[in-house]
UniProtKB/Swiss-Prot annotation:
The keyword Protein biosynthesis does not apply. Displays ATPase and GTPase activities. InterPro entries: P-loop_NTPase, RapZ-like, RapZ-like_N, RapZ_C. This is Nucleotide-binding protein Pmob_0154. GO terms for molecular function: ATP binding; GTP binding. The lineage of its organism: Bacteria, Thermotogati, Thermotogota, Thermotogae, Petrotogales. GTP binds at D64, I65, R66, W67. The keyword Transmembrane does not apply. It holds the Pfam family PapZ_C. Belongs to the RapZ-like family. ATP binds at G15, L16, S17, G18, A19, G20, K21, T22.
Length: 287
């Protein structure tokens, strides 16, 4: 069985106060990321290494000038890739905005700048301190005059090259064990001929050659694979434009051992061969 999302993905976010870090964190939380705001730079190494042994595989954290230790922050962003004890995908994000825009935002919210100086002096000082960190980030976004919905769309457009397209996770399952709660799309393939009723295939699975050869004798098997694969590609392309990160295609038969395993595996292989971002999990194959 292959585990989904085995490679942790981390967004390490910083930038100017008032530039939209909280909004970005909320957007990533909506996409299933575990989020932490205002974390001290010296604790980030511990957070990263928790991912190596926990079920949390998607993390977004904000660390910025609020801890008033810019040198620690600079060192963190320059060396963060070397801190993790396991392989993970780390995206360093820097958000900024024009000084006039930041002043307007602070006036609207009536909040105090974390540096505690007069507003203009605080912004000038922060821009000066954070400039070195900006140069070490792989994603830099200027949020000046940007509406929240536009900002989210721009962010996901900018990371598309790193994250590729929306990830499609295929799960085969047995209806007798319940539909996976995480499913976005559910396909019922119980109309296909069932190898379960043939003694020589009873204990086999949809990954075994004898079962594959049996199912491939039927026209509807090939039609099912083609239709699900084409729909999956269509949905992946459309959802990628909206900024969504992943979707779950769950394919079920009675027990989750033969037909659903075969169909899910074949669709996965087709999309994988095309270079698309996909994963496969045969949930009930060993039950």
């Amino acid at each position: 069985m292959i585990t989904l999302l085995t490679k942790p993905t981390v967004f390490l976010i910083t930038g100017l106060s008032g530039a939209g870090k909280t909004l970005l964190l909320q957007s990533l939380e909506d996409e299933g990321y575990y989020t932490v705001d205002n974390i001290p730079p010296h604790l980030i190494e511990s957070f990263l290494n928790i991912l190596c042994t926990s079920n949390v595989k998607k993390l977004a954290i904000v660390s910025d000038i609020r801890w008033k230790d810019p040198q620690k922050l600079i060192e963190l962003f320059k060396n963060v890739e070397s801190l993790a004890k396991c392989t993970m995908e780390i995206h360093k994000v820097f958000l900024k905005a024009d000084k006039s825009e930041l002043i307007n935002r602070y006036k609207k919210t009536r909040r105090t700048h974390p540096l505690g100086l007069s507003l203009e002096n605080a912004i000038d000082e922060e821009i000066k301190v954070m400039s070195e960190i900006e140069s070490s980030c792989d994603i830099v976004i200027d949020t000046s005059s940007t509406e929240p919905t536009e900002f989210k769309k721009r962010f996901f457009q900018m990371i598309k090259e790193d994250m590729k397209k929306l990830k499609l996770n295929f799960i085969s399952f047995g209806f007798k064990n319940g539909i996976p709660p995480i499913s976005d799309y559910v396909f019922d393939v119980r109309y296909l001929p069932n190898p379960f009723y043939f003694p020589e295939m009873y204990e086999l699975t949809g990954l075994d050659m004898k079962v594959m050869e049996f199912l491939e004798k039927f026209k509807e098997t090939h039609e099912t694979v083609d239709k699900i694969a084409n729909l999956a590609k269509f949905i992946q392309d459309k959802y990628s434009e909206s900024g969504r990160i992943e979707a779950y295609f769950c394919i079920g038969c009675t027990g989750g051992q033969h037909r659903s395993v075969y169909i899910a595996q074949k669709v996965y292989e087709i999309l994988k061969k095309e270079g698309r971002e996909v994963s496969i999990d045969h949930r009930d194959i060993e039950r």
